[in-house]
Swiss-Prot record:
Family: Belongs to the small GTPase superfamily. Ran family.
Protein name: GTP-binding nuclear protein Ran
Keywords for the protein's UniProt record, in alphabetical order: GTP-binding, Nucleotide-binding, Nucleus, Protein transport, Transport
Annotated stretches, region: Switch-I: 33-41
Gene3D superfamilies: P-loop containing nucleotide triphosphate hydrolases (3.40.50.300)
MF terms in GO: GTP binding; GTPase activity
Organism expressing this protein natively: Dictyostelium discoideum
Keyword Manganese set for record: no
BP GO annotations: protein import into nucleus; ribosomal subunit export from nucleus
Length: 212
């Protein structure tokens, strides 16, 4: 992947899980989102500065189209990587992750994909770290995130960059400029979640596919 190349990142997940809020945390400066009316898509240019140079993601956001059924193939075509997002306070949004993954891989096949559980700032968490195993079945990465607090915002993008470059040594040399947090996280709770995520990764996978 050349440094100047722009990367198409497909962002999918149920309506209301926080996809647009997440992508709009990044203050893109001179780059403005553009709307593609034929697909009902907003494309957000997100720039990250790494030890391998500038990385330019064009993040394709559904702009609510997922509420009207499946997305058109044109949304996925030529996708270089993807984020599947669910809401940790909504079990159904996690149960629907396999459907989004199936749609993605049907069109894009072998692209790097990150699974993100959003809204970990909300106290009433329904989907516990120990229940999140889909990513392990399909060799995806997983991160707890919180769009409203910027928690772990950059991690999915750094992981995707490392996969696209084929180099695990990717790091940010400059933190992205983000909107000010709208909520303050409980640091003790986040530490607990991080431990639970790490502990869950060491457990054997359940034999059935019904994670919840």
């Amino acid at each position: 992947m050349a440094e100047k190349e722009q990367i198409k990142l497909v962002l999918v997940g149920d309506g209301g899980v926080g996809k647009t809020t997440f992508v709009q945390r990044h203050l893109t400066g001179e780059f403005e989102p553009r709307y593609i009316p034929t697909l009902g898509v907003s494309v957000h240019p997100l720039i990250f500065y790494t030890n391998f140079g500038k990385i330019h993601f064009n993040v394709w956001d559904t702009a609510g189209q997922e509420k009207f059924g499946g997305l058109r193939d044109g949304y996925y075509i030529q996708g270089n990587c993807a984020i599947i997002m669910f809401d940790v306070t909504s079990r159904i949004s996690y149960k629907n992750v396999p459907n989004w993954h199936s749609d993605l891989t049907r069109v894009c096949e072998n692209i790097p994909i990150v699974l993100c559980g959003n809204k970990v700032d909300v106290k009433d968490r329904k989907v516990k770290p120990s229940q999140i195993v889909f990513h392990r079945r399909y060799n995806l990465s997983y991160y707890d995130v919180s769009a409203k607090s910027n928690y772990n915002f950059e991690k999915p993008f750094v992981w995707l960059t490392s996969k696209l470059l084929g180099n695990k040594a990717v790091t940010l040399v400059q933190q992205p400029t983000l909107k000010l947090p709208e909520t303050v996280l409980d640091s003790n709770l986040m530490s607990l979640y991080e431990k639970e995520v790490a502990d869950a990764a060491a457990l054997p996978l359940p034999e059935d596919n019904d994670d919840l």
